[in-house]
Each structure stands twice: as structure tokens, then as C-alpha cells.
Amino acid sequence: MKRWTISQVPHLVHGRTNGETDPLTLFWTASGLEVNVRGGELWVELSADWSMYEPWYSFVVNGEFLSRRMAEKGTHRVCVFRGMNPETVKNVRIVKDTQAMSGDPESLLQICALETDGSFEPVEPRALKLEFIGDSITSGEGSIGAKAEEDWVSMFFCAENNYAVMTAQAVGADVRILSQSG
């Protein structure tokens, strides 16, 4: 297993960021990192903090939603996949599910590094780019969870079930989202 910083590997950054990749700070819904990995396993090192609203994130492998997690405070290694065919290339997206939490100035989610037993391949940028500006629906609020849920909590935000992300996928575009519940 070898550890790589984001700037050391071919990648695409999704969403508006501060322009830095070491670490890559994720602010907005559906912001994230996309890489192509030829290897049997991939781990991501994430750093997170918050006082009220914990960030949530998802892994998408080969275009399919794979898993979703709450970010733990501090810096942690998380397995994206393991035990897969080391000869095939896997397209991986690490995606922030929650919106920018203006009510929690400590809210933070950063991708610090990647670890794999393989190598990274170039990621082809999409020809189209869409940007959505909106409110709670655009932030993915309520796009996951039981229909009866009415609590306003981070775990009910989801980028994968979001109309902006679905629209971009339908037309083969990259997506940027600037939105805030209100």
C-alpha cells in the first residue's frame, strides 16, 4: 500500500473549492474528488470537524452508489473498496452529501490522502458542466430517509438522490451546487 496526496494523482475536483488539493476541502453539496484506480483496494484519509452539524459523505464506484457515512471528528482512514480485481480500473467518486453549514463555523470535511495497492489512471473530464444555485431541495435535504421524517439533521441530506446530480448524470455533465436550506 502506498499513500498519495491528492496533487500526486490524476484526479477531477467536483464543486467549488478554495483551489487547494492538499488537503481538498469540500464545502458544498456534491463537491468531491474523482479518481480512476487500478488496484485491489483503496483507502481515503479524511479530516472532519463540527460542533453541531456533522458532515456526511458517500462513495460512488463505477457510477453506482456504494456506501454512505457520517464523518468522524479528527483524521481517519476509511476503506472505499478492497478485495477487488487488481487489474481492472475502478472509477471512484468521494462525494460530500451535506450542504455548507453556515450555522456551524467549525463544520469541516477534507480529503487528505489516498492509499492503494495499485496505481492511478487519468480521469477524462466531461464536456458539459452544470451549476445549480438553490435552496433546500438543491442541497439534497430530505432526499434520503423515511417520508415521515421531519427532523432537520445532517443525515437527511444526500447528494446521490439530489435532482441536480441526477440531471447532470442524465446529460453526462459535471455538476456544481451552491445551495443553502432556508
Predicted features, each with a name:
Residues 1-133, 137-156:
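N-terminal secretory targeting modules
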Residues 173-182:
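A short beta-strand-loop structural module common to alpha/beta enzyme folds
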Residues 154-165:
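Short catalytic helix/loop segments, enriched in acidic residues and glycine
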Residues 164-174:
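Short helix-loop-beta junction
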